[in-house]
Amino acid sequence: MQKIPLTVRGAELLKQELQQLKSVARPEVIEAIAEARSHGDLSENAEYEAAKERQGFIEGRISELEHKLSVAHIINPTEIHAEGKIVFGTTVTLEDLETEEHVIYQIVGEDEADIKQGKIYVGSPIARALIGKEEGDTAEVQAPGGVREYDIIEVRYI
């Protein structure tokens, strides 16, 4: 079984979502199903059908989260002795050599990735180009719009 890399924060967020689904959403949908059943004929009961559909989604998501957490490889970047190299969980400041703009990214697992928050998936082209590099290096990224070059300004393990 392949391990799924997660940062400590990513694992916490999945655990929180799982807890919310089990302790709030699941009981609410069970109550909604019971309420809909009390209205009689289930064959044409839209409330019942909607509640059952919602229950299926909730149970599926609970299963998915439990699986992900069971195969998670939780990585704390502050505990990695990467000696200045960019690794999973690293936060890196880059300068786009074409635009001279600075961007900050954290390299995270697939479930945590959110470009708007500066979190990029470890399997993305930019993350793959950065892994193993260190401050002062230049990374070439094969992007859909062509090759982009970035200077690595700072590497942090936070």
From Swiss-Prot:
Necessary for efficient RNA polymerase transcription elongation past template-encoded arresting sites. The arresting sites in DNA have the property of trapping a certain fraction of elongating RNA polymerases that pass through, resulting in locked ternary complexes. Cleavage of the nascent transcript by cleavage factors such as GreA or GreB allows the resumption of elongation from the new 3'terminus. GreA releases sequences of 2 to 3 nucleotides. The keyword Transcription applies. Keywords: Coiled coil, DNA-binding, Transcription, Transcription regulation. Belongs to the GreA/GreB family. HAMAP family: GreA_GreB (MF_00105). This is Transcription elongation factor GreA. PANTHER family: TRANSCRIPTION ELONGATION FACTOR GREA. Pfam families: GreA_GreB, GreA_GreB_N. One of its GO terms (biological process) is DNA-templated transcription elongation. Residues 46-66 form a coiled coil. The gene is greA. One of its GO terms (molecular function) is DNA binding. InterPro entries: GreA/GreB_C_sf (IPR036953), TF_GreA/GreB_CS (IPR018151), Tscrpt_elong_fac_GreA (IPR006359), Tscrpt_elong_fac_GreA/B (IPR028624), Tscrpt_elong_fac_GreA/B_C (IPR001437), Tscrpt_elong_fac_GreA/B_fam (IPR023459), Tscrpt_elong_fac_GreA/B_N (IPR022691), Tscrpt_elong_fac_GreA/B_N_sf (IPR036805). Disulfide bonds: none annotated.
